[in-house]
């Protein structure tokens, strides 16, 4: 297994939290920690008149969020490599933090095809 990719849709969220850049950054940091991932860097951008996009770069991959406060909606991806992290825990935390009334979570195992040749060569 290369890793796990979780796609999270949050509905009925707190619109003020969805438009608070500092809150989004704090939530991404907490999600990284609870997933057992190492946060390397973070970038966020606040749109006018509303909405935020954020990316938490992890040693294990990434967490991204895109918010639409006017629709009380957020789209989140959590992708972690290896089997030492728990991306579902990050998703659960983010759903709670943003006060989602409902959510939809899809999880996928990411893996290389078993039939592919190992391209590592010895000199």
Curated annotation (Swiss-Prot):
The EC code for this enzyme is 4.1.1.50
The entry's keywords: Autocatalytic cleavage, Decarboxylase, Lyase, Polyamine biosynthesis, Pyruvate, S-adenosyl-L-methionine, Schiff base, Spermidine biosynthesis, Zymogen
Q: Posttranslational modification, per the record?
A: Is synthesized initially as an inactive proenzyme. Formation of the active enzyme involves a self-maturation process in which the active site pyruvoyl group is generated from an internal serine residue via an autocatalytic post-translational modification. Two non-identical subunits are generated from the proenzyme in this reaction, and the pyruvate is formed at the N-terminus of the alpha chain, which is derived from the carboxyl end of the proenzyme.
Residues of the active site are: 61, 66, 81
Q: Which GO terms describe its biological process?
A: spermidine biosynthetic process
The parts of the chain that form a coiled coil are: none
Q: Which Pfam families does its entry note?
A: AdoMet_dc
Q: In which pathway does it act?
A: Amine and polyamine biosynthesis; S-adenosylmethioninamine biosynthesis; S-adenosylmethioninamine from S-adenosyl-L-methionine: step 1/1
Give site residues, Cleavage (non-hydrolytic).
Answer: 60-61
The PTM Pyruvic acid (Ser) maps to: 61
What does the entry comment about cofactor binding?
Binds 1 pyruvoyl group covalently per subunit.
Q: Name one GO cellular component term.
A: cytosol
Q: Cross-referenced InterPro entries, in alphabetical order? A: AdoMetDC_C, AdoMetDC_fam_prok, AdoMetDC_N, S-AdoMet_deCO2ase_core, S-AdoMet_deCOase_pro-enz
| Cofactor requirement | pyruvate
Q: State the top-level EC class.
A: lyase
Gene Ontology MF terms? adenosylmethionine decarboxylase activity
Recorded catalytic reaction(s): these are:
S-adenosyl-L-methionine + H(+) = S-adenosyl 3-(methylsulfanyl)propylamine + CO2
Q: Which NCBIfam families match?
A: SAM_DCase_Bsu
Subunit structure, as described in the record: Heterotetramer of two alpha and two beta chains arranged as a dimer of alpha/beta heterodimers.
* Family membership: Belongs to the prokaryotic AdoMetDC family. Type 1 subfamily.
Query: What is the documented function of this protein?
Result: Catalyzes the decarboxylation of S-adenosylmethionine to S-adenosylmethioninamine (dcAdoMet), the propylamine donor required for the synthesis of the polyamines spermine and spermidine from the diamine putrescine.
HAMAP family associated with the record:
AdoMetDC_1
Protein name stated in the entry: S-adenosylmethionine decarboxylase proenzyme
- Which species is listed as the source? Prochlorococcus marinus (strain SARG / CCMP1375 / SS120)
